[in-house]
């Protein structure tokens, strides 16, 4: 899951700061999601899925269909 959110961000040519801003959080906090240091709350997963126009199932690795 953590690799997928990083890959989606990089594919969109976005910085961690930009995604963190969308989520209303600090870059440091968001970075900890990408590295797996912190678990990603459900509401953040939903927001990321909407942001990247994908499903929560894709982010969680339950499907490979974006």
Report residues per predicted region.
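Short basic helix-loop element that most often maps to the first helix and adjoining turn
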Residues: 3-22
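Residues that mark the N-terminal boundary/hinge immediately upstream of a DNA-recognition element
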Residues: 4, 15, 41-44, 55
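DNA major-groove recognition helix of helix-turn-helix/homeodomain DNA-binding modules
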Residues: 24, 43-58
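Recognition helix of helix-turn-helix/homeodomain-like DNA-binding domains
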Residues: 24-39
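Short, conserved catalytic or interaction motifs in soluble domains
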Residues: 35, 53, 64
